[in-house]
Amino acid sequence: MLINGTVVALILAMMLVLIQDLRRDSVVMEAITLPKVLINRGFTPVGTSHWLNHHVLAISDLAATTKSQNSFQDQDSEIEIDVPGAGISLRSISKALRAVLGIKQTRVAGEIICTDDICSDANMEMRLRVYDKEGIKIIPVGTFGDVLAANLNDDDLDLYFETAALKLFEYLDPYIAAAYLFQTKKSGGRERAVNMVKANHPDRAWAANLIGLMDMRNEEFESSDYWLERAIEFSENDDIAGFARPIATFGYSLHRRHLWDEALEKYDIAIKVDPTYPNVYFLKGLTLFRMKKFLQAKNEFQTSSEIDPASVRSFHMWARSAAALGSKKEAEKMFQKTAAMKQVDMQLYPQWYNFREGLGENGDDIMKSWEINLGIVAKDLLPEECMPLLVLMARFAKFNQKCDWPYYQGELLEHKEFCESEMLNEKSAP
């Protein structure tokens, strides 16, 4: 009975794992075949595949989208369970069932080949092979010389593998490539998104929304309105349920033109379309904050943070709203909560400093209470960080002898014009 129970438990466990595997829209990254010259230099087929997958996952992450995506995994990370005495495994069962049921599982393999007789660095080329329901697709990445114009080293190879990963996304999911280029401020994102719309890609609503967002940020509002309206139209025609993003983005575009009431109308429509979309509550809160309706704004930021507890900006604006209402304890609690989160808004400490100073606290005492926090911020301070944080860091450096006061003083002078222009832009936006 014990043996039978164990067998039943094993079968049930395998069935659960199998069901989960079949439900995943997964892409398996297989080994990349290499020429001997690279193997002799320490490269391996599996390691090369891992390197490519690392950049695939990085692009997917930096695209910062909630759109459904493929799940990428290395071949050697696939779950493999052998059935004793049966000569079969979970992987083989999964493959067979996918074939019978017509369930897609994309596999990516490839090779690096030599395009000249001596197999020089510049003339090696990666070619990816994608196996999916459409058949086999060959994706040439280009030679190392074409992409890099440099010898092989880790930094150059990272750029090459990023290029390879982008080309893979252009075939598998072009929206991710476009969003990644937009989020990382690289060229080519708009062109890819426009091509998706022209091709009537299934994600054309997402692409049109992205174009509208790009144009809004460039203050090209007429073009932005056009693309956001198309995104809304596409989502309706393509039956994309709960696609509130272009409506919310349209609302924020109106906000940036100081059309507060019209913006609020758009946000309310977006909330009806998708009441679980946290960004629309945050954007509505920003508009209410600019209208000095601080209590209503605070409620929106609170709702946004409840839906998305990792939203640093929601807690930050909750703190600012509470401070504007004179709710000192609540504001201090929210400032502290925001500071404890991993990604801190650059404006947090200057605003928190002003809040505490406004309560009558001594500036040196405030600095002392933040010594550890500001030390961490100082360590990661970038030259392009703007005036409010630089000013505060300069105060901290003067207060704390461990910090390099001349350095921050120099940073203030060097970036004064840039930071003042950025602050001017901040005044025209929330």
Please provide the spans of the model-predicted regions:
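Short beta-strand->alpha-helix linker/helix-N-cap micro-motif
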Residues: 22-121, 133
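C-terminal/domain-edge helix-coil "capping" segments
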Residues: 1-22, 117-120, 131-214, 218-226, ...
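Helix-start (N-cap) detector for alpha-helical repeat units in TPR-like alpha-solenoids
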Residues: 171, 204-205, 238-245, 278-279, ...
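Single-residue signature of alpha-solenoid repeat helices
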Residues: 190-193, 224, 263, 297, ...
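Residue-level recognition of tetratricopeptide repeat
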Residues: 179, 213, 252, 286, ...
